Amino acid sequence: MLLVIDVGNSNIVLGICDGTQLVRNWRISTDKSRTSDEYGVLLHSLFASAGLGFDTVDAAIISSVVPPLTGVMEAICRDFFHLTPFVVGPGIKTGMPILYDNPREVGADRIVNAVAGYEKHKCSLVIVDFGTATTFDYVNARGEYCGGAIAPGLAISLEALFQRASKLPRVDIARPPQIIARNTVNSMQAGIFYGYVGLVDEIVNRIVAESKDTPRVIATGGLAKLIAPESRTIVEVDDFLTLDGLKILYERNR
């Protein structure tokens, strides 16, 4: 089976693929202070809870936007699974032209999402990935990655408000009961939540206008299901887009 690993700034998402099927997946917190041994022990516990052994994995692929942890994940694959993983980066076969000024600058997760989105839909796309940063990526109808936009993530925005405004409390990310809120917590949630919905729709609409296209807009990432129902532009949420993209890239490079 194939182990797919997506290392983000806030979370590490792992999956086990058996053929074309994603059979198990886990989400753990990103911690740059953890060693490969510590992550290995954690993975052993996750595998055991799923009734799996490390010997069921015979291949692995890694996407990482956290350079200090890329080597840690490679070490886990070598030391615990006894294999050399593929790492998404320069030189890997994507099957997708990257129309970026410097293709090496594009985050691995953005390329993985673009590859998966186009492979699944075979049409022009805007992919919105809600992570520590929220990324907007445009793929044209020819399957070319054209670039996009990066915005501060929802959690970062909320944390900045708490840190910089002395009298405002730290609040959870949530859809408030109404936009005209009657207490401070709901007022903050209303401003952040609906402000962010507006940010998403405005950026998508500008991408659509600039591209002179009618792309399908899909969302992924931890907060996609929270934002998408209020968005006027997002038509689909794909929770496993990145893991599916890693599986596709593995098949193209094996």
Curated annotation (Swiss-Prot):
Residues annotated for substrate binding in this entry: Y100, G107, A108, D109, R110, T184
Catalytic activities: (R)-pantothenate + ATP = (R)-4'-phosphopantothenate + ADP + H(+)
Binding site for K(+): D129
Protein function: Catalyzes the phosphorylation of pantothenate (Pan), the first step in CoA biosynthesis.
Pfam families: Pan_kinase
Organism, scientific name: Pelobacter propionicus (strain DSM 2379 / NBRC 103807 / OttBd1)
UniProt-annotated location(s): Cytoplasm
Keyword Coiled coil on entry: no
A GO term, aspect molecular function: metal ion binding
GO biological process, one term: coenzyme A biosynthetic process
Family, similarity comment: Belongs to the type III pantothenate kinase family.
Residue positions of the active site: D109 (proton acceptor)
Annotated metabolic or biological route of this protein: Cofactor biosynthesis; coenzyme A biosynthesis; CoA from (R)-pantothenate: step 1/5
Binding site for ATP: D6, V7, G8, N9, S10, N11, I12, V13, T132
Cofactor note: A monovalent cation. Ammonium or potassium.
Keywords associated with the record: ATP-binding, Coenzyme A biosynthesis, Cytoplasm, Kinase, Metal-binding, Nucleotide-binding, Potassium, Transferase
This protein's name: Type III pantothenate kinase
Subunit and partners: Homodimer.
Presence of keyword NAD: no
Enzyme class name: transferase
Cofactor: NH4(+); K(+)
GO CC term, one of those recorded: cytoplasm
Stored CDD domains: ASKHA_NBD_PanK-III
InterPro entries: ATPase_NBD (IPR043129), Type_III_PanK (IPR004619)
EC number: 2.7.1.33
